[in-house]
Every structure is written in C-alpha cells, then in structure tokens.
Amino acid sequence: MQVSGIDHVNILTDDLEKTASFYERLLGLTRAENPAVRMGIAGYWMCDAEGNPIVHLVDRLSAPGRYDEYRPGEVTNAVHHVALRCEGFDDTVARLKEMACEYRVNDLQHLGLRQIFLADPNAVNLELNFKGD
C-alpha cells in the first residue's frame, strides 16, 4: 500500500449551520449532501471547486450515543491543526477582516510561502498555505 494524500478531514460540531457557513464564506467551499444523512446523522460535505469533499461536517447532536465522548471546542490532543493549500491570499485576508475572525500571518519569503493561522467555530486550528501567491 502507498498513501497518496489526505482524503478529507471530519469535524464534529454542535452548530452545523454556523460551521458550514464559516467554510463557505472564508474558504469558498460549497455544501453537498452527506451520504450519512440517510443514516439519520445530519451533516454536509464541504467541497472544493472540483467537487472534492475535503471537509466533512457532522452534527454531533444528531447521532445520540455515537459521538457523546467528543466535545467540539475542547483540546484535540495530538492533532494540532489542519493545513490546506489555498489561492488568493489578499482576498482571504479581506474575508477574515469582514468576518471579524482573529488570525495570524506568517510570511516565509525564503520558501515563497505565506500562511494564515486561525481557528474555526469549533476551535479546530487551521493553517492556510499560499505558495507563490
């Protein structure tokens, strides 16, 4: 077996609509039906411009018993952050300001890389990487 990349990130939330709106407004992802909805679990797949579901959102409260031990917003222990390849640095900064989100910029000129660090509504740490942008 050989791993070719990360397929998606799954995020549990107690506020599905707020979280989906955050990923739509900031990252330009679009909502798609989550096939698990048929199993009674509410959620969305947040897709990139090519239709790839890269962030899965699950309403933790719609699945009693299944996710009871997980608490959005609490420390995630070993998983520190999720890094995403992005385009449109200036537009992203403008959207962050418009959304009144706290963020930090790291400019690694020697690597041709600019980064934005922030947290989503569930305290998931995000690293947005802009290469040559």
Regions found by a protein language model. Name each.
Residues 1-17, 79-82, 132-133:
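N-terminal beta-strand motif that seeds the catalytic metal site of vicinal oxygen chelate
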Residues 1-2, 34, 93-133:
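Vicinal oxygen chelate
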Residues 5, 40, 78, 112:
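Exposed loop/turn and edge beta-strand positions of beta-sandwich/beta-sheet ligand-binding modules
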Residues 12-54, 106:
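Core segments of cupin and vicinal oxygen chelate
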Residues 75, 81-89:
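Mid-chain, well-packed structural core segment of small domains
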